[in-house]
Amino acid sequence: MKYIFISGGVISGIGKGVTSASIGLLLQSAGYKVAPLKFENYLNIDAGTINPIEHGDPFLCEDGTEADMDIGSYEKVLNQDMGSDNFVTMGRIYQTVIERERRFEYNGEDVEAIPHITDEII
């Protein structure tokens, strides 16, 4: 398995999503299987409650995920359905870890960013 990371820090609207989708299409046409993933550092669970003036309109996936507009670009360019497996927010990661802590899955450990959050990301 090979990974390509495209990062833009805090710069928004410069075409990272379209560039990523285009690179994916080139790889697909060369016979590679492509699975785009988008990770957002905001603490919202999904993009559905973010002010569209601030972040753009959310893209509604077939599975009900309210994702970033880039997920729509991935769907259109790559001709693949995207969903919750393709769009992850830091809020969703924290939510998963907190739910596990509430179910006592950490056996009473102190739940911390390292290692619990980082393990969830990996």
Locate predicted features:
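Flexible phosphate-sensing "switch/lid" loops adjacent to ATP/NTP-binding sites
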Residues: 1-122
